[in-house]
Amino acid sequence: MVEDKEEKVSRGYHCVWQIHYHIVFPVKYRKSLLDEEVRRIIVETAEEIEKRFAIDMEAIGCDKDHIHLLCSAHPKIAPGKIVQIFKSITAREIFRRKQAVKKELWGGEFWTDGYYVGTVGERGNWDTVERYIKRQEIGRASCRERV
């Protein structure tokens, strides 16, 4: 996959796309569990997800109880699949690397079942959404910022 950063256009073997998603989902029961250590686990895991699944994580913003993703992927990967991949792999890694989190939750799930997804256009709302996601961490250590 080749990406034109200036226009945020990606190219594959047989298609060219400009699809960016703003995805939001909270921690189960809206618990404030996204501390610095958990955020670091999420960022490290997101980098592995990028490599393994060819999902471009353009920005990640964490508040104490929810996360915002600005991402892009090949059109054959549905937004729901991106959410499923991200939630399942990050939850597994969080439970594996910070076992104390399990005591805060019951039922063995880290993320809620639901989520929000919207498309972000190149003209108009891209900068607004990107700024909003990056501002999730004003006054705290940033979860991840990528330009």
Give the role of each language-model region.
Residues 1-144:
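Basic nucleic-acid-binding interfaces
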